[in-house]
Amino acid sequence: MTERNTSTDSPEKRAAGIAAAGLVSSGMLVGLGTGSTVAYTIKELGRRVREEGLDILGVVTSYQSEMLAIEAGIRLTTLAQHPELDLAIDGADQIDSELRAIKGGGAAHTREKIVSVSARRFVVVADESKTSKQLDKLVPVEVLPFAKEPVVKKIRELGGKPQLRSAVKKDGPVITDNGNFVLDVEFGVIKDPEALALQLSSIPGVVEHGIFCNVSELYIGNKDGAIKIITRQK
C-alpha cells in the first residue's frame, strides 16, 4: 500500500506522533486529528494494525485525516455510532504553559473540538516550536456565511482584528468541511484564554473558535527522538 506523503519529514513531529500512538491499545475508540504531526500518529497506528493486529476504531476530524486513515488501513466509525471516545490525538498551532491551545490552521477546528470533548483523554502532539508561555497567535473562528459581518462587528468590539481567510489555490474565501467561512483574528497576547473562549462562543453566528482549554497531556518531540510529556495540573 502506498501511503500519501503528508509533509516534509520532521524528526520532532515524527517522535511526538509515534509516541502518542503508543497510548492506543486494542478495543479503543480513537479520535484522529488533522495536521502534519498527527499524520505520523495515523501512519504508526496503521502500521500496528497491519503488523501487530491492533484492533481499533477511529473517528476522523477532516477529509484529510479520513484519507490518511483509510490508506493506513484503520477502520473508521462516527460519533453518531460512538459518541464517547477513549482517546483523541491532535496537533496544535500554539500551546501555552498551562496547556491551553490555539488550533485551526487547517480550518478543521470545529470537528477537532467536537472530537476532543467527546474523548475521556485529549493528547496534543507537537514540536518545541509550537510551545509558548502565552497564546498570541491568530485565533481561527468558523462563522456562518450569513452571519459574517455581524460576527466581525462583535469581534471588533472584543478588541480583535478579524480577517477573512482567503483560499490559496482558488479565488475567494476558504470554505470549511462544514461549508462555512473562517475568520483569522488577531488579539495580541491572550491573557485569559478561558474568558475569551466563552465570549467568542456567545456570539450568534460563530460556529466554533480555535481556543482549546481541554488538553489533558502534551507530547513534545525532539530531533533526537526524545519525548517530553507535560500533564495538565488538576
From Swiss-Prot:
Its EC number is 5.3.1.6. GO terms for cellular component: cytosol. This is Ribose-5-phosphate isomerase A. Catalyzes the reversible conversion of ribose-5-phosphate to ribulose 5-phosphate. The active site is at 112 (proton acceptor). Keywords: Isomerase. Pathway: Carbohydrate degradation; pentose phosphate pathway; D-ribose 5-phosphate from D-ribulose 5-phosphate (non-oxidative stage): step 1/1. One of its GO terms (molecular function) is ribose-5-phosphate isomerase activity. It catalyses: aldehydo-D-ribose 5-phosphate = D-ribulose 5-phosphate. The keyword Kinase does not apply. InterPro entries: NagB/RpiA_transferase-like, Ribose5P_isomerase_typA_subgr, Ribose5P_isomerase_type_A. Gene3D superfamilies: 3.30.70.260, 3.40.50.1360. It comes from Methanosarcina acetivorans (strain ATCC 35395 / DSM 2834 / JCM 12185 / C2A). The gene is rpiA. Belongs to the ribose 5-phosphate isomerase family. GO terms for biological process: D-ribose metabolic process; pentose-phosphate shunt, non-oxidative branch. Substrate binds at residues 34-37, 90-93, 103-106, 130. It is an enzyme of class 5 (isomerase). Pfam families: Rib_5-P_isom_A. Homodimer.
